[in-house]
């Protein structure tokens, strides 16, 4: 179901959440991928790892912003992103930051895909973490929207927040 503003409900149990995420990662028109996910689990990374690598191979710029809130995010899942940080021969890049403030709940989930050239894009925003449950089997609600400008602005705001620290080997060692 959708409305005139191009918003649609996307759920894991319908199969649509994973299908939409996979489609957006594969879509050659999207050269920017912004992942704002409170909890990143190895089970979720395993579902999208090959497509993240394909996006990087074709020149996409990928940013992950997660958190150490409640120590839920998986070390191995962050390791996948850490291994890919930096500039790649294709002109692509991957950056990752961790929002670290024990006094603040950090709980957003947004998967934002856009074209740097046209500004067009798709976002999936709702309750799905980057986990097998969040993408395939859990009871989660997400909206698919083509209205992404405000989301990108807010993502950039969080990205530049002083509490969003770069993911590094040293940071990950302390997190273990």
Q: Where on the chain are the PLM-derived regions?
A:
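PLD/PLD-like phosphodiesterase catalytic module centered on the HKD motif
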Residues: 1-176
């Amino acid at each position: 179901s959708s409305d005139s503003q191009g918003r649609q409900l996307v759920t894991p149990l319908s199969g649509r959440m994973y299908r939409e995420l996979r489609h957006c990662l594969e879509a050659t028109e999207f050269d920017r991928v912004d992942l704002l996910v409170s909890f990143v689990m190895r089970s979720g990374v395993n579902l999208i790892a090959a497509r993240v690598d394909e996006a990087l191979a074709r020149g996409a710029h990928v940013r992950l912003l997660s958190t150490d809130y409640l120590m839920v995010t998986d070390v191995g899942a962050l390791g996948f992103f850490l291994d890919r940080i930096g500039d790649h021969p294709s002109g692509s890049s991957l950056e990752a930051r961790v929002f670290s403030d024990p006094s603040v709940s950090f709980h957003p989930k947004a998967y934002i895909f856009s074209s740097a050239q046209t500004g067009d894009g798709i976002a999936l925003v709702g309750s799905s973490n980057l986990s097998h449950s969040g993408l395939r089997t859990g009871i989660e609600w997400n909206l698919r929207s083509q209205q992404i400008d405000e989301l990108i602005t807010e993502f950039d705001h969080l990205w530049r927040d002083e509490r969003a620290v770069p993911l590094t080997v040293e940071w990950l060692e302390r997190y273990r």
